[in-house]
């Protein structure tokens, strides 16, 4: 904010969910919502245009898998995905409330994965480990963000 940007992309939430299930230090949905609300308010006060981004994915398949060298059963994966969807709904709601632009990366990633993951791979489509983006994932986000800069 101190650099006084004209445009700010706010893209947070993956670690809030992932760390909740991985190391027990993530955020619950109220903490996430209140924190995101504060970031939006502080950023809007500068006059910058805000583009809110939904969190993307944890894992690229349906079912259990090893996430960053840590096995996760199907129940845990379903819970993480339910949390990611709830966090994405928070972003969508706050975007309407604060009249910001919305970049629904979660929807975009899920669509891309459903069209390009015929083998139900847990990683390698848009991430290299189920969480961290590979070159294709980074390019997909960059291409989506560029649309807002034109």
Where are these regions (language model features)?
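Alpha-helical cap/lid subdomain in secreted, periplasmic
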Residues: 1-150
């Amino acid at each position: 904010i101190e650099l006084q940007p004209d445009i700010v992309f706010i893209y947070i939430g993956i670690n809030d969910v992932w760390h909740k299930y991985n190391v027990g230090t993530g955020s619950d949905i109220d903490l996430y919502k209140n924190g995101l609300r504060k970031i939006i308010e502080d950023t809007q006060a500068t006059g910058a245009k805000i583009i809110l981004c939904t969190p993307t994915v944890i894992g690229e398949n349906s079912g259990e898998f090893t996430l960053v060298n840590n096995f996760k059963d199907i129940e845990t994966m379903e819970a993480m995905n339910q949390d990611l969807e709830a966090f994405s709904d928070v972003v969508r709601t706050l975007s309407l409330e604060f009249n910001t632009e919305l970049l629904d990366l979660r929807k975009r990633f899920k669509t891309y994965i459903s069209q390009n993951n015929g083998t139900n791979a847990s990683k390698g489509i848009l991430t290299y480990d189920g969480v961290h983006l590979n070159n294709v994932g980074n390019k997909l986000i960059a291409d989506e963000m560029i649309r807002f800069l034109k």
